[in-house]
Curated annotation (Swiss-Prot):
FHL comprises of a formate dehydrogenase, unidentified electron carriers and a hydrogenase (isoenzyme 3). In this non-energy conserving pathway, molecular hydrogen and carbodioxide are released from formate. The keyword Glycosyltransferase does not apply. Its cofactor is [4Fe-4S] cluster. This is Formate hydrogenlyase subunit 2. Keywords: 4Fe-4S, Electron transport, Iron, Iron-sulfur, Metal-binding, Repeat, Transport. [4Fe-4S] cluster 1 binds at C12, C15, C18, C159. Binds 4 [4Fe-4S] clusters.
Length: 203
């Protein structure tokens, strides 16, 4: 099981502090400054959406240059290897991969890019992925758990309500055990007598 960041929508206040922290941290390390997570809002609650670091990682499967790999229990993307094909963004079932880029320094700002033909029409479902701007290289960006920072993900550290948590195998096993215990209590009654009996047998 990979590590990933999970959000508690009951604590999230939709302040976008996590997005700002993510953007600034990556910018300081020379990476694309686009936030690796996006706060989603509805009428009742809010919560950030970000990479789930899937076990099968469809984004890594479709990447033609192996820019996306599994490293230290997380799915990491090497921006320097990205060739802007956008297959990973199309393959991601959670829409957790965005594309960002900047104009190379040797291309003047007044280059004749406005005269270039517009991007060809695309289905609404993938239109944002297929949009392009002449002279700007689109780089895939996704949550990397701030692997370059010993303190861990900036979003987790900076969230004012502690709505974000980094979880790993141990955390998942503990929660799973607790859920099983609660289910047993619901179906078979109080566990206390059962646990006492088990303790007595052990003695």
């Amino acid at each position: 099981m990979n590590r990933f960041v999970i959000a508690d929508s009951t604590l999230c206040i939709g302040c976008h502090t996590c997005e700002a922290a993510c953007s600034e941290t990556h910018r300081q390390h020379g990476l694309q400054s686009m936030p690796r997570l996006r706060v989603m809002l509805n009428e009742k609650e809010s919560a950030p959406q970000l990479c789930h670091h899937c076990e099968d990682a469809p984004c890594a499967v479709v990447c033609p240059v192996n820019a996306i790999t599994r490293v230290d229990g997380a799915v990491q993307l090497n921006e320097s290897l990205c060739v802007s094909c956008k297959l990973c963004g199309i393959a991601c079932p959670f829409g957790a991969i965005e594309f960002s880029g900047s104009r190379p320094l040797d291309i003047p700002a007044n280059a004749n890019t406005p005269k270039a033909p517009p991007a060809p029409p695309a289905p609404a479902r993938v239109s944002t992925l297929l949009d392009w701007v002449p002279g700007i290289r689109a780089i895939a960006v996704k949550c990397d758990l701030c692997s370059f920072d010993e303190q861990g993900p900036a979003c987790v550290r900076m969230c004012p309500t502690k709505a974000l948590h980094l979880v790993d195998n141990t955390d998942i096993a503990r929660v799973s055990k607790r859920k099983r215990e609660l289910t047993f209590n619901t179906d078979f009654g109080d566990l206390t007598l059962f646990q006492q009996a088990q303790s007595g047998e052990a003695k």
